[in-house]
Amino acid sequence: MTQPPDLRVVVGTLFDHHEELKRAVERYPVACRVDRAPPQDRLFRMMRASRAAIAHGGDTLYELACLGVPTAVVCPTVRQLRVADRFAGAAAVLNLGVHRTLTRSRFQRGIIRLLRDTRLRRCLRTAGPRLVDGRGAQRVARTLAELAAS
């Protein structure tokens, strides 16, 4: 028998529906934890240990890609959809679209695919770090130092 996944929902400090989410998760038939704005080092460890993730776009998308975490993206806005489209074009995420138009069926199919398709997860795991290497700040600092020196 297959072991149910260890599910964890992580929300930021600006998320307004934390208590509502916790109540909804308590009704879910699989054990799931809700963490609100964990310390960065703990969040990093959670991301690193994840078999897969569902992200809402933003900076988290870059962090998960850099760490090689296979990720499905549900975008809150069309603006973030453009970013997710570029990530998906580089085979770095599974883009499920904008949440307002995302059907429950499409969401479920996407998540099931992410969890069951080992080839897809392997592809996302390797493409993410190729797209986001985590060294952007170093490149910016080097460029600024070069500009200051000239």
Task: Name every feature range the model reports, one short phrase each.
Residues 1-150:
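Nucleotide-activated sugar donor-binding and catalytic core shared by glycosyltransferases
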